[in-house]
């Protein structure tokens, strides 16, 4: 393994490939992409004891096509992907030890369907639990999971967050 590579769980990450991937993402998404240090720091801060490690760039996804296109590009270059919701990160999951692309899902915050009789709701990953419960208030339904912070549904799902309720 060269100085330009990192390995974890049998996967090798090449810094040159990651930089090429980030360049391609930047070209494709333009203003939806940022590689500013302050934005990258905001997207790597965790509530754990571990030191934050920054992604190489952040994509502010607006829809599932943005996510799909970014994932395809990252796959071509074997570039790590770090999904980002609200960013409370009690689990340290937004840390980027190998760099890569943080995909911010906050703009994907629509409640798509409420099937009251079936007790079923379809949401985008950026919807927060407070947003969902406000929307459901007049239906007699509520989302009982409460991890303490106003976490996104996508973040809660990805980390199995359950809270105290």
Give, region by region, the residue ranges found by the protein language model.
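N-terminal flexible segment immediately upstream of the FAD-binding catalytic core
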Residues: 1-72, 88-119
């Amino acid at each position: 393994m060269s100085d330009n590579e990192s390995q974890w769980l049998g996967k090798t990450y090449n810094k040159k490939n990651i930089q090429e991937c980030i360049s391609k993402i930047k070209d494709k998404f333009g203003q939806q992409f940022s590689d500013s240090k302050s934005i990258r720091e905001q997207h790597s801060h965790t509530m754990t004891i571990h030191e934050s490690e920054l992604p190489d760039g952040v994509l502010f996804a607006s829809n599932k096509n943005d996510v799909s296109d970014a994932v395809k590009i990252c796959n071509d270059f074997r570039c790590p992907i770090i999904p980002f919701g609200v960013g409370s990160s009690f689990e340290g999951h937004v840390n980027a030890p190998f760099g890569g692309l943080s995909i911010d899902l906050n703009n994907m915050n629509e409640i798509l369907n409420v099937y009251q009789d079936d007790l079923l709701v379809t949401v985008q990953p950026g919807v927060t639990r407070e947003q969902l419960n406000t929307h459901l208030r007049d239906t007699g339904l509520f989302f009982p999971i409460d991890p303490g912070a106003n976490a996104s549904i996508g973040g809660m799902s990805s980390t199995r967050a359950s809270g105290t309720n």
